[in-house]
């Protein structure tokens, strides 16, 4: 039997999929029409060493990250990469611009 201290799921948790579908059906304007991330910066070529075929935690640790991963599990087969900012270490700033990604139904499925 379940513990009496367990919180029942909220209305939003119970209706997550319906809310998500309603969001995409509404066709929200999430980015300007002229925005095309592929044409934005074709001069950038990702370095080969950024490719990581091991677990995301191992990939992160291999790129200079450290720490406990806890109980990290993933049910999806996403291609995750670790990003380390070495240009302005410790400043929290970067001179490079990061392209924005439009949230699409395919990204969260």
From Swiss-Prot:
Maturation and modification: Phosphorylated with a circadian rhythmicity, probably by the double-time protein (dbt). Phosphorylation could be implicated in the stability of per monomer and in the formation of heterodimer per-tim.
From what superkingdom does this record's organism come? Eukaryota
- Keyword Endoplasmic reticulum listed: no
- Can you name a GO cellular component term? nucleus
Where is it mostly found?
nucleus
**Carries keyword Protease?**
no
Locations of Low complexity compositional bias?
69-98
Tell me the keywords, alphabetical order.
Biological rhythms, Cytoplasm, Nucleus, Phosphoprotein, Repeat
- Which GO BP annotation is one of this protein's? rhythmic process
Q: Where are the stretches annotated Disordered? A: 59-109
Q: Which residues form a coiled coil?
A: none
Localization recorded for this chain is:
Nucleus; Cytoplasm, Perinuclear region
- Tell me how this protein assembles: Forms a heterodimer with timeless (TIM); the complex then translocates into the nucleus.
Q: What does this protein do?
A: Essential for biological clock functions. Determines the period length of circadian and ultradian rhythms; an increase in PER dosage leads to shortened circadian rhythms and a decrease leads to lengthened circadian rhythms. Essential for the circadian rhythmicity of locomotor activity, eclosion behavior, and for the rhythmic component of the male courtship song that originates in the thoracic nervous system. The biological cycle depends on the rhythmic formation and nuclear localization of the TIM-PER complex. Light induces the degradation of TIM, which promotes elimination of PER.
Q: What is this protein called?
A: Period circadian protein
This protein's species is Syritta pipiens (Hoverfly)
